[in-house]
UniProtKB/Swiss-Prot annotation:
Membership in a protein family: Belongs to the UPF0246 family.
Domain of life: Bacteria
Name by which UniProt lists this protein: UPF0246 protein VSAL_I2547
GO biological process, one term: response to hydroperoxide
Taxonomic path: Bacteria, Pseudomonadati, Pseudomonadota, Gammaproteobacteria, Vibrionales
Any one GO CC term of the record: cytosol
HAMAP family: UPF0246
Length: 259
């Protein structure tokens, strides 16, 4: 099965790397095209477009300016280590074995506004450009129009390479909108994670993001190959709820967390 996850806003270019192995992104020319668009933006433009502080806007103006189509260990690091958000806390790639990295490279993909689709060990230069950003470009009014069918076609290639026709959607709605399920040569299965809060089960963003990372790790670490095996996911107190699941959605719940 192939797993897709969202990227993270928070980045880490300081922590030690668990492997020196790296690969090149597939869409460098497309990324460079977007960078040329972004370089025309002032920090004020960036702040308004991305709804970020002046400090973050200025930082990203510098990042756009310094971005290079040549990816090296000096200006980049592997995407799996560069992203540092709740999903990646759950994934905990720093503790992967060499075999885990090899498996992840074939079975995990990260969606990205700037890079389109990343393999775990693809080198990545720092950036901030969320998929939902309404960045006008030569291909359309936003990044969904910019990427068109490219991400889906690359996913189809990865699906073909890894050998079965199942895609596990652990990405957010904002990012999965960049994928066109009707054109995918795979069944899309979307796990849903609900936590109990004040007696009601609901999707709590922080917990759900971390759970997506935990499930991605579970699949990678245990070489999960079937949906029946995936239903056995029982990490951090989550359990499968058959009565609230369907062919396309798998429901997992967890009792209230008291700190």
């Amino acid at each position: 099965m192939l797993i897709v996850v969202s990227p993270a806003k928070t980045l880490d270019y300081e922590s030690p790397l668990a492997t020196d192995l790296s690969t090149q992104p597939d869409f460098i020319a497309d990324s460079e095209e977007l960078i040329h668009v972004c370089r025309k933006l002032t920090p004020l433009d960036i702040s308004s477009l991305m709804k970020v502080s002046d400090k973050i806007a200025s930082l990203n103006a510098i990042r756009f300016e310094e971005w290079s189509p040549i990816f090296t260990s000096d200006n980049s690091r592997q995407a799996l280590f560069a992203f540092k958000g709740d999903v990646y806390t759950g994934l905990d790639a720093a503790s992967f074995s060499d075999d885990d990295f090899d498996y992840a490279q074939r079975h995990l993909r990260m969606l990205s506004g700037l890079y389109g689709l990343l393999k775990p060990l693809d080198l990545m230069q720092p950036y901030r450009l969320e998929m939902g950003t309404k960045l006008a470009n030569d291909r359309g009014a936003n990044l969904y129009q910019f990427w068109g069918n490219k991400i889906t076609e690359k996913l189809n290639a990865a699906i073909e390479e890894q050998g079965d026709k199942t895609l596990i959607n652990l990405a957010s709605n904002e990012y999965f909108k960049a994928v066109k399920p009707a054109l995918l040569n795979a069944d899309v299965i979307t796990p849903i994670f609900k936590d109990c809060k004040n007696g009601q089960y609901k999707i709590i963003s922080f917990y759900a993001k971390k759970a997506r990372g935990l499930m991605a790790r579970f699949i990678i670490e245990n070489r999960i190959a079937t949906i029946e095996e995936l239903k056995r996911f029982a990490v951090d107190g989550y359990y499968f709820v058959s009565a609230e699941s369907s062919e396309k959605e798998l429901m997992f719940k967890r009792e209230e967390q008291f700190k």
